UniProtKB/Swiss-Prot annotation:
This is tRNA uridine(34) hydroxylase. It comes from Rhizobium meliloti (strain 1021). Belongs to the TrhO family. GO terms for molecular function: oxidoreductase activity, acting on paired donors, with incorporation or reduction of molecular oxygen. The active site is at C190. The lineage of its organism: Bacteria, Pseudomonadati, Pseudomonadota, Alphaproteobacteria, Hyphomicrobiales.
Length: 315
């Protein structure tokens, strides 16, 4: 774990919202007691998003004004356990979340494997500036620890895609692929760093010795590495209404199918199988007519809310 307080500051643009992604693995036995005061400080400052609290730490993404985010982060870092919290910042042209939720969980990122503790055993952090050299090494096997709907829109060159539906499937995928031991180095990455950090702890437990992970995840890489030097291909899926970001953490061109939650390209929107809010190329064949009619009713409510200048919670 890191033991320094740091932040990536980006110049504020009028009318934009600041988005802060954060996580910290640390023993936090009083996590349940922190939920209400954390929810209160978020609500008081107009901050929205989701924060997860568990015995193993904190994880989440929030958005708001510069001042609002600063107030929430100050509250979190005022807890001795989170004094060394690192967060990553990006911008959104509109508020990317509908509400603020502080939730209590068994794990801040769910792997479902007992006794995996990144606070005790973890892989070696690799700074974004050193990542290209590592993954270009023929002795390195690069593994994406994200889910299939995320990897569908972007990957590092040469990365292995486990095509998991959830992070819970990752341990089984590792156990079923003995060929992963064929190369001496394993390099892992994810969106912001939390999944690959926990995954490296699992890999070490499985007997892999030389395990690395991208510090700060794809987001930090896209922030720091210019496009002309980048080995990233595509866009990075994010879990808010921006849907994706690209180099410089600029908002991508993807939208989300509100029926199946799959990211869509502008080309996907032109498909005859696409009906806004109802179906897309990914889910058209899996929906019944009853499903479609229910989604159409929801979409009508969303459009009515937009006309009133409001936002429908189902959007």
């Amino acid at each position: 774990m890191t033991d320094m307080l740091t932040t990536s500051r980006r110049p504020e643009t009028p009318g934009q919202f600041l988005v802060a992604a954060l996580y910290h693995f640390v023993s936090f036995p009083r996590f349940a007691d922190f939920r209400e005061p954390l929810q209160a400080i978020c609500d008081a400052n107009g901050v929205k998003g989701t924060l997860l609290l568990a015995h193993e730490g904190i994880n989440g993404t929030i958005a708001g004004t510069e001042e609002g985010i600063a107030a929430v982060l100050a509250c979190v870092r005022a807890q001795p356990e989170f004094a060394g919290l690192i967060h990553k910042e990006s911008r959104a042209s509109a508020m990317p979340f509908l509400r603020m939720k502080v939730r209590l969980k068994k794990e801040i990122v769910t792997m479902g494997v007992e006794n995996i503790d990144p606070k005790k055993v973890v892989g070696t952090y690799v700074e974004p500036k050193d990542w290209n050299a590592l993954i270009s090494d023929p002795e390195t096997l690069v593994i994406d620890t994200r889910n299939d709907y995320e990897t569908a829109i972007g990957l590092f060159q040469g990365a292995v895609d486990p095509k998991t539906k959830t992070f819970r499937e990752f341990p089984e995928w590792v156990r079923n692929n003995s060929g992963l031991h064929n190369k001496p180095k394993i390099a892992m990455y994810c969106t912001g760093g939390i999944r690959c950090e926990k995954a490296t702890a699992f890999m070490k437990e499985q007997g892999f010795e030389e395990v690395y992970h991208l510090k700060g995840g794809i987001l930090k890489y896209l922030e720091e590495i210019p496009p002309e030097e980048s080995l990233w291909e595509g866009a990075c899926f994010v879990f808010d209404e921006r849907v994706s970001v690209t180099h410089g953490l600029q908002e991508g061109e993807h939208t989300l199918c509100h029926a199946c939650r799959q990211p869509l390209t502008p080309e996907d929107l032109q498909s005859p199988l696409h009906e806004e809010g109802v179906s897309c190329i990914h889910c058209h064949d899996t929906r019944t007519e009853e499903d479609r009619e229910r989604y159409r009713q929801r979409q009508r409510q969303i459009m009515l809310a937009k006309k009133r200048g409001a936002r429908h919670l189902g959007s």
